[in-house]
Each structure stands twice: as C-alpha cells, then as structure tokens.
Regions:
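Intrinsic-disorder-associated, low-complexity terminal segments enriched in Asp/Asn/His/Tyr and depleted
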Residues: 213, 224-226, 240, 248
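Positively charged N-terminal leader segments that act as targeting/secretion signals
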Residues: 227-237
Length: 253
C-alpha cells in the first residue's frame, strides 16, 4: 500500500478543488461503526492498537489472516515461530437498523482457501491463523451505544487448533458455544497478555499426538452429554453420528 492519506487531501475536478476533502468522504461513509463491515474493520484496528502494531502501513484486506503480531513462541512439537497469526471476528447485539429484539451473537469460523504466490487460490480450505480473537460489542442500549468507548467491548481469545479439533469444518459458532470452549477472556488492556498466554500457556498449546486427540474427544463428549441432559434423545443421536457417522453439525445458541 502507498503512503497513508491524512484526510486533508482535496477532491479535485478540472484541476481545481471542489470544496470537499477526503475527510468529508470518510465522515460520510465511515461514521456508523455499528455497520457490520465497518465494525469488523474497526475491530481489527482495536486489536492492532492493543498489540501496539505498526499501523502506518495501512489496512490490508487480502491476507490469509487479519493481523501479524511479532512474538517468538514455540509449539508443543518444539517448532519455533517469530510471529503470531491472528484472525479477528466481531459481533454486536445492536445493529444500524431498527430492531424488534437484540441480535443473536454468532461468529464466523469458516475455513478458507488462501491465495498462492502464483495468484491462484489453494485447493485446501483451512483456518489460516494461530489464534482467533472474537470481539463482542456488548452494549445493548442504542441511545448510549458508542463503539469508540472500548469499555463496552469483550474479547475472547481461542487457539485455532481448538476450533479445528472441536468444531471441525463448522462455519459459525454461537456465543454460548464459544464460551464452552473455555476461551481466554480479556478487556482492551488485556488483549496483548491474552495472546501471549494463548501461545505460551498449556491451556492454549495443543498436547502432542494421541493425548491431544483424546483430550479433544473427551471435551466433545462432555459438551454433548451436557446438551443431552437439556435436550433429550436428539443430542444423543448427534453424539453418535459425530463419531460413528458423517454428521455435519453446526452449533446454535
């Protein structure tokens, strides 16, 4: 990306200023931070500032993941990495339009195909990051809602391996299901420490081999057992098909 604009640039026609600045366009197009698209981009900006990333390079929308945090860490197999790849997802109870009720909170966790160096899309679909940060704007009062006040945000940090193991190819996850994954929960001031904890701590580093798979199996057993207690036989059938048949299950709240 080229040099970042300041907002003071004139919009010109026939070599003359029209009387409008680039900042006028920004103000017109980007003031409603409750808009789904803008809220997603703003969430990435929030996380970037919390991690003290270099934001002078501008927003890049076509990378396989959203943000890269320079930090040296080691996985359970002893492989060392110099950065943490971060995927940022956002959701909000309130929307720009008039609502009869608050929105259900659902985040996208869809596996994606990345662009290869030759310009073609990879045939393999997977989650590309090391860590997911789920950003929830938790304000429910439209009259007082202001996404610029970061006290109103909640952040849930989950290692990607856990989504892969527990959710498989699932495309979305509800807030209730996300909380069952035992994420690291943080406010704005705790995002950086949560990322470090996630890649260094035992709860976010996958155990090796058989133990890893066994732990994931037990976790899903417990989740489905809990649902069976609430929902009856349907959840037991779901558990059966989860492990003994092809069953594409998307969790709901």
């Amino acid at each position: 990306m080229g040099t970042l604009k300041t907002g003071d640039e004139h919009i010109r026609f026939d070599g003359m200023p029209t009387g409008y600045l680039l900042s006028d366009f920004w103000r017109w197009s980007s003031s409603d931070l409750l808009d789904n698209t803008l809220r997603g981009t703003f969430s990435e900006f929030i996380v970037g500032t919390a991690l003290d990333l270099d934001l002078t390079t501008g927003f890049e929308n076509w990378l396989p993941w959203d943000l890269t945090y320079p930090f040296q860490w080691q996985d359970s197999l002893g492989q060392t990495y110099d950065e943490v790849r971060i995927e940022v997802k956002s959701a909000s109870y309130i929307q720009p339009w008039e609502q009869e009720k608050l929105s259900n909170i659902v985040f996208s966790i869809r596996p994606t195909a990345k662009w290869e160096p030759d310009g073609r899309r990879s045939d393999q679909r997977q989650r590309q990051s090391d860590v997911y940060i789920f950003c929830l704007y938790a304000e429910t009062n439209r009259r007082t809602a202001d996404p610029l006040i970061l006290d109103g945000w909640e952040f849930y940090i989950v290692p990607t391996w856990k989504l892969d193991e527990i959710c498989g190819p699932q495309k979305t996850i509800s807030l209730n299901s996300l909380r069952q994954l035992d994420p690291i929960r943080a406010d704005y001031s705790g995002i950086q420490a949560a990322i470090v904890q996630c890649v260094q701590g035992d709860e976010c580093t996958p155990p090796p081999g058989i133990l890893h798979n066994f732990c994931a199996f037990c976790y899903v057993i417990l989740v489905h057992y809990y649902k069976a207690a609430r929902n009856g036989r349907a959840a037991l059938f779901a558990l059966y098909f989860r492990f003994f048949g092809r069953y594409d299950h998307e969790e709901t709240s």
